[in-house]
Regions:
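Extracellular zinc-dependent metalloprotease catalytic-domain scaffold
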Residues: 1-84, 89-157
Length: 157
C-alpha cells in the first residue's frame, strides 16, 4: 500500500515549484512509520510531517498511524487513501505553507492558500479561468486548521 501511495504522488508531482526540471523518487521504505503514535479508534487516523528541509522543501519525514484504526481502514479499502493523505503532509502539503508564506488570513473566518499553481487550477475548477485563492480549513485542532483544504468547499479531501 505504501508503494501504491508513493506511486500516486510520483504521478501528481511532475515538476519543481520553480519550473525547473525535477527528478522525484519517493521511497516508502524511507519514511519511518510509527503505528502507535495516535491513540483512540475513530479519532485522528494518522499524522505526518517533514522532519528535514533542504532548500526550504521537505527532504524527509515521518508518518504515524493509529493502530486502533488500521484493521478497519484496511478492511474497508480506505487505508491507501489515508497513506496518500499523510504522505502528502510529509511532502509539505499543509505542513510548510506557513513557512513559505502561502496562507493569508490565518486565524480568520476565511484563510486562503495563495500558491500560484493551486490558484490557477482552482480558478479552472470554478470556471473563472482566473487564479483564485483556495479556501483552507478555518476550524479544527493543530494540524487541521490552516493545513487542509476547507471541507465545506471540497468535502473530505
Amino acid at each position: 500500500m505504501f508503494a501504491n501511495a508513493a506511486e500516486r504522488w510520483s504521478e501528481i508531482i511532475t515538476g519543481a515549484a520553480d519550473g525547473s526540471s525535477l527528478s522525484l523518487t519517493i521511497e516508502a521504505g524511507g519514511i519511518p512509520i510509527d503505528r502507535g503514535g495516535v491513540p483512540g479508534e475513530g479519532n485522528v487516523l494518522g499524522r505526518a510531517a517533514p522532519t528535514g528541509l533542504r532548500n526550504g522543501l521537505p527532504s524527509n519525514g515521518i508518518m504515524e498511524f493509529d493502530t486502533f484504526d488500521l484493521d478497519r481502514l484496511e478492511n474497508d479499502g480506505s487505508l491507501v487513501n489515508v497513506i496518500i493523505h499523510e504522505m502528502g503532509h510529509v511532502l509539505g502539503h499543509g505542513t510548510i505553507w506557513r513557512r513559505r508564506g502561502l496562507v493569508i488570513g490565518e486565524g480568520s473566518f476565511d484563510p486562503q492558500f495563495i500558491g500560484i499553481n493551486a490558484m490557477e487550477e482552482f480558478g479552472v475548477l470554478l470556471g473563472t479561468n482566473r487564479p483564485t485563492p483556495v479556501p483552507v480549513a478555518n476550524q479544527g485542532g493543530p494540524g487541521t486548521e490552516g493545513a487542509h483544504w476547507r471541507e465545506t468547499t471540497f468535502g473530505r479531501e
